[in-house]
Amino acid sequence: HTTVSNEQKAHAARELGANETILYRGLSVDDYVKKYTDDRGYDVVFDTVGGDNLDASFQAARFAGTIVNIAARSTHDLTPMHSRGLTLHVVFLVGQVANPLNRHSIKPRLEKLSELAENGELQPLIDQQHFEIEDVADAHAYLESGEPIGKVVLTR
């Protein structure tokens, strides 16, 4: 299952293999957890948004479930996590890549990802709208609008 903000994103998610899409606008976490998991919650919640979505992830996970987050850059009350026995994994790939001590282990992984992308086995989701580097403010506004489906690309 994946949560999306509109039908266009739901279609894209299904094209990528999601077996169920949940339009979260106007639907509470409790509502979709009850509907799709018989009120048990999800074993694993993968959060790529962060912010308030991380709090929603705590709510969507089952007791003793796992949350994986790649975008946590804010402060959160972890009480719901502790009271439900959740495990939280926060991954900051940029920090790992930027650390010179990790270059020996990161380089082969990035090369493998590049190979998979070149062979068509890994298909990055890139939004149709691209921006020139001079238009970075417009690109950021577009990103913040929630409209993009995939990554927003800046070009020189």
List PLM regions with ranges.
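Glycine-centered, small-residue-biased loops immediately flanking beta-strands
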Residues: 65
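Helix-to-beta-strand junctions that scaffold the AdoMet/dcAdoMet cofactor pocket
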Residues: 61-62
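Terminal peptide-recognition signature
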Residues: 13, 45, 57, 113, ...
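C-terminal capping/lid region of NAD(P)-dependent oxidoreductase domains
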Residues: 119-125, 137-156
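Adenosine-nucleotide cofactor-binding segment
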Residues: 1-52
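C-terminal substrate-binding/catalytic core of Rossmann-like NAD(P)-dependent dehydrogenases/reductases
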Residues: 80-128
